[in-house]
Design a protein with these regions (language model features):
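Conserved HGGG/HGGXW glycine-rich cap/lid loop of the alpha/beta-hydrolase fold
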Residues: 39-85
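Active-site loop/oxyanion-hole signature of alpha/beta-hydrolase fold enzymes
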Residues: 76-116, 272
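Gly/Ala-rich beta-loop-alpha elbow adjacent to hydrolase catalytic centers
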Residues: 117-121, 125
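Flexible "cap/lid" loop of the alpha/beta hydrolase fold
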Residues: 126, 130-166
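Conserved alpha/beta-hydrolase catalytic His-Asp/Glu region
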Residues: 151-152, 166-219
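Short beta-strand/loop motif that positions the catalytic acidic residue
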Residues: 221, 227-229
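Acidic catalytic loop of the alpha/beta-hydrolase fold
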Residues: 232-236, 262
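Catalytic histidine-centered segment of alpha/beta-hydrolase-like enzymes
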Residues: 256-270
């Protein structure tokens, strides 16, 4: 069973070592060998991979990436399938995780020092750890739903059918942006990239997000995992985090009473650095 604790830190992202942002796109390769589109920040000796939330993109983790790069990490930021700038439509969390494992095998030596994910990205990270138990030395799993919500899944298609035609309208985009509590400077990329997501992909990844189930293989996970959840998240998210901590023997559960869904990745980058460095 994982350890538990409570923390209330808050800091701003470091502006050091921003460097040039590298982008990789796949060439003309067979479908079964399609590579994930990635952005890379930093040139440190240690490697971290961070997986963004559903409906967002790599910039979800820009604050964390800046801080990690300033502290000796090379940070790889994949774009999940079905999102703006990705190389293919969204199919499943399991397939995204398989692509991630292949990416780490092909380009990062088969193992990374740190693996993190938030929401949908956290589910992909968990699936990668289930598929390859020692793919990372440390992991941060933030706001991961691992208890299926069947009713929510059934409502995804009709909800998207109603809201999707409004995505490009500024008033709707601004309302959605405000509901997510994102930093103001992210509005432009948020609006641009949310408009680029197809209706089919939006339905697909929202359905997968609401139906993902905790995998028994995580009991053998070799990464030291920190599981983050906010007290202002829906109760099922807190229950998911606690179930995950029980399922992963070498994990630490940290519940932040006043935090919302995905807040650490956006507003508290130091939490990731501390977890990856093994600090309390």
């Amino acid at each position: 069973m994982g350890r538990t604790g409570r923390e209330e830190p808050r800091a701003h992202a470091s502006a050091q070592a921003r460097g040039s942002l590298q982008r990789r796109r796949p060439g003309n390769v067979p479908v079964e060998r399609i590579q994930m589109v990635t952005h890379t920040l930093g040139t440190g000796a240690r490697t971290a991979v961070l997986l963004h939330g559903g409906g967002l993109s790599w910039w979800n983790y820009r604050a964390v990436a800046d801080l990690l790069a300033a502290n000796g990490y090379r940070v790889v930021l994949p774009v999940l399938d079905g999102h703006a700038g990705s190389d293919r439509p969204f199919t499943s969390i399991e397939e995204n995780a398989s692509e991630l494992v292949a990416l780490i095998d092909r380009e990062l030596g088969g193992r990374v020092d740190a693996l993190g994910g938030v929401s949908l990205g956290a589910q992909v990270a968990l699936e990668a750890l289930a598929q390859r138990s020692r793919i990372a030395g440390r992991a941060v799993i933030e706001s991961a739903l691992v208890l299926p919500m069947r009713a929510a899944r059934a409502l995804v298609a009709p909800a998207v059918a109603l809201s999707y035609p409004l995505v490009r309208r500024p008033w709707f985009s601004q309302a959605q942006f405000a509901s997510l509590h994102l930093p103001e400077e992210l509005y432009e990329p948020y609006h641009r990239d949310s408009c680029a997501i197809s209706k089919r992909d939006m339905i697909a990844f929202m359905r997968e997000n609401s139906s993902y189930r905790l995998k028994p293989e995580l009991a053998g996970c070799g990464a030291r995992a920190t599981i983050l959840v906010g007290g202002k998240e829906p109760r099922i998210m807190v229950r998911s985090a606690r179930a995950l901590a029980k399922a992963m023997p070498d994990s630490t559960l940290v519940e932040h009473p006043g935090w919302r869904h995905g807040e650490a990745s956006l507003w508290h980058p130091e939490v990731y650095l501390e977890a990856f460095e093994g600090r309390p």
